[in-house]
Amino acid sequence: MTKFVGCIDLHDGQVKQIVGGTLTDSSKDKVTTNFVSKLPPSHYAKLYHENQVEGCHVIKLGPNNDEAALEALNECPNFLQVGGGITLDNCGYWLKYASKIIVTSFLFDKSTYQFQREKLVKLAEICGKDRLVVDLSCKRVTKPDQEPKWVVAMNKWQTLTDLELNERTFADLCQYTDEFLVHAADVEGLCNGIDEELVAHLYKWTADIPKVKIVYAGGAKSVDDLRLVEKLSHGKIDLTFGSALDIFGGSLVKFEDCVQWNHEKHA
């Protein structure tokens, strides 16, 4: 059944909530920030751990976040997942502290933006598919008189790759991982509602794949969105809240209500 999954987004060493489409590689470009926490990353790690919110992730959005990420991970070793700048060279290091590592941009060529399968194969060999999460954060691409499609975006969601989300893509990638994180970059941080069409498609594309986990993020604005995702995905997809959540300065969703949902659904 659908459950609430927590996140800790780090930017310049602080816990923040950011509008996804405003992140860039340039420090000169202004990032639209919904929330900057006065509390350390370890506070949120402890909060999730004490309330048994499992499968939570720490995402390093750009440089200067390693120390903050380690602080969160060390608060409850092997409890949190970690993503952001993960490569073949450092994945072993992060797995000393994290339950799983999360990868996106590393899997694509930096110049052509093409998916490089051999990198995923090597990561799976080193980490094991049960400790590897593939981040398929995406943007909607719509053309006149055509059905919308969702294409994986890299480089802080600014660059479209050649990898389209569909049944074939998931069937292929499931050879190397058993979990996916999907940010709907177009609605991330806006608190205007989830991409219902994407959630429904995620279920459709993976309905015949056993034991695969998907966490959806982007736009959630009400605790009722847990019920909506459960309906759209037949309970197969989990949901994370960001800017709408009270622990991140939001006024739309109470953390305790999300925890209660989990306890009632998974008692």
From Swiss-Prot:
Catalyses which reaction(s): 1-(5-phospho-beta-D-ribosyl)-5-[(5-phospho-beta-D-ribosylamino)methylideneamino]imidazole-4-carboxamide = 5-[(5-phospho-1-deoxy-D-ribulos-1-ylimino)methylamino]-1-(5-phospho-beta-D-ribosyl)imidazole-4-carboxamide
Keywords linked to the UniProt accession: Amino-acid biosynthesis, Cytoplasm, Histidine biosynthesis, Isomerase
GO cellular component, one term: cytoplasm
GO molecular function: 1-(5-phosphoribosyl)-5-[(5-phosphoribosylamino)methylideneamino]imidazole-4-carboxamide isomerase activity
Matches recorded under CDD domains: HisA_HisF
Pfam families: His_biosynth (PF00977)
Entry keyword Cytoplasm: yes
InterPro entries given in the database record: Aldolase_TIM, His6-like_euk, His_biosynth, Isoase_HisA-like, RibuloseP-bd_barrel
Biological pathway: Amino-acid biosynthesis; L-histidine biosynthesis; L-histidine from 5-phospho-alpha-D-ribose 1-diphosphate: step 4/9
Family to which the UniProt record says this protein belongs: Belongs to the HisA/HisF family.
NCBIfam families: hisA_euk
Protein name: 1-(5-phosphoribosyl)-5-[(5-phosphoribosylamino)methylideneamino] imidazole-4-carboxamide isomerase
Originating species: Kluyveromyces lactis (strain ATCC 8585 / CBS 2359 / DSM 70799 / NBRC 1267 / NRRL Y-1140 / WM37)
Gene assigned in the entry: HIS6
